Amino acid sequence: MLQQRSLKTLTRAVGVGLHSGQRVELTLRPAQPDTGIVFRRVDLPQPVDIPVRAEAVTDTRLASTIAQGSAKVHTVEHLMSACAGLGIDNLHVDITAEEVPILDGSSASFVFLLQSAGIVRQNAPKRFIRVTRPVQVREGEGADAKWAQLAPYHGYKLSFEIGFDHPAVDATGQRVEFDLGRGNYRRDIARARTFGFTRDVELMRANGLALGGGLDNAIVMDDYKVLNSDGLRYDDEFVKHKILDAMGDLHLLGKPLLAAYSAFRSGHALNNRLLRALLAQRDAWEVVTFEDERQAPGGFAQPAQAW
């Protein structure tokens, strides 16, 4: 039986929120089978649980935000991406502020935290949402067009194309494909950092955003070049970060996907629209388990090795 996964023990991290600049403490704790991933705002007078699901997403401007009533958690996508890449099904996430810490701007620190705590198999079948026919969402026309699609695939594959007209981005790949069954999330995707432009950062800070951002947790560019002294971690780091974000956004479905995801200039908003469109078309998906691990797609049978 292909089993669900959680942590062996708890682990903690301290950092700042990318947009709020607030200090935040994060505690990742084991959870029982079939719990799912549940965020808990422990800083509130009465702690509030926010279970991960597509419908819990309430804001997608600059990041993915989930909420339960008035309690919110912003910028969940990098932690969720690490959970997707490592196959984590059940997890308690205790947080002392309204934004997940940005750490180094990628998901690598979250991967390290999760693997340091130990990943264990649980005595319950891992449940997938398997896409049975294509579902697509689109936005804009012509040069402004954006789209994202899920199609049937025996595994989990993501293909993303960006369209940034910038010398530093043009010099790298603007399209990448990652197959969880053939690649290695930790090696190929996890270290890709979020990125932004100085002109946008100045505007965001004037509006009380990006207060925790800087060269130590993002790729920053002026109109011509990358400003980080250490350059890029991957030749195609920009588009690989979009794959990282997409994996996090799609893991907000609450169950791992068996599908081929493809997108052109998509973002948090379109990714969430895609999940909602999928769920609304009940004939486009089914829940499946694998009693025989040998029948499971590649990339899901064995937990990733520790660093």
UniProtKB/Swiss-Prot annotation:
One of its GO terms (cellular component) is membrane. It catalyses: a UDP-3-O-[(3R)-3-hydroxyacyl]-N-acetyl-alpha-D-glucosamine + H2O = a UDP-3-O-[(3R)-3-hydroxyacyl]-alpha-D-glucosamine + acetate. Coiled coil: none annotated. Pathway: Glycolipid biosynthesis; lipid IV(A) biosynthesis; lipid IV(A) from (3R)-3-hydroxytetradecanoyl-[acyl-carrier-protein] and UDP-N-acetyl-alpha-D-glucosamine: step 2/6. The active site is at H268 (proton donor). Zn(2+) binds at H78, H241, D245. Its cofactor is Zn(2+). This is UDP-3-O-acyl-N-acetylglucosamine deacetylase.
